[in-house]
Amino acid sequence: MSYKTEKILINTFTAITTLFIIAAIFLSLMFACFGAIYIKSSVRGFSMYPTLNESVESAEQNGDTVFINKYQSINRNDIVVANVEWWPSGAIIKRVVGLPGDEIQILELETQYNLIVNGEVLYSRSKEDDAGNSLNNFIHYQKYLTFLSDLENSECVGVGQNGLPCIKVRENEYFLVGDNWNNSVDSLTHGAVSKNDIIGRVDIIVKLKDNYFFSLIGSMLKIMFN
């Protein structure tokens, strides 16, 4: 081996080693910062299906993994995790559909139930669904009506833009509903959740079916460079 060839090999090895060291330092710093901001949690149940736990077979099984940002502000349509007294078995994970000052209703129509926020239809559930879901929709609607009746004469109840009773979201409270809201215990039957009870916003979802490491790294890099 000539001196020139040997020098090229040494320089190449040094460059590769340096790149590995820089990458290792970068990843270490990234994970350190990440750990200071985020809380990791596994999701159980199907109240956020199909957004979460789409490939999970049992409600008792640990499904998708989420990373909860403790410091970000909360906006409509965010997914958040909260500790609430009416769900003692652990934290709940739901979507923010109502902000302070919003008016929330479920309206029964001939063929469907509409979840209405400030007069606008946010979600719909058909009455013509398969038997199980249709029954769940009906039961959930009846629970909502019971809850609304229990709140009568409370400051939490008002009149919506359509002239029908609505739930009013108070200051420093958020209205949380599961994406699979006919199979969810949430604000529609237990009321809005205090801002102080919200742990944080879900920024990263790692699906059970995905490669954990590469999915997490990809999500972290996306957050960093967006």
Outline where the language-model segments fall.
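Soluble "head" domains of membrane/secretory-pathway proteins
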Residues: 2-15, 20-22, 39-43, 50-226
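Aromatic-capped interface at the extracytoplasmic side
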Residues: 27-48
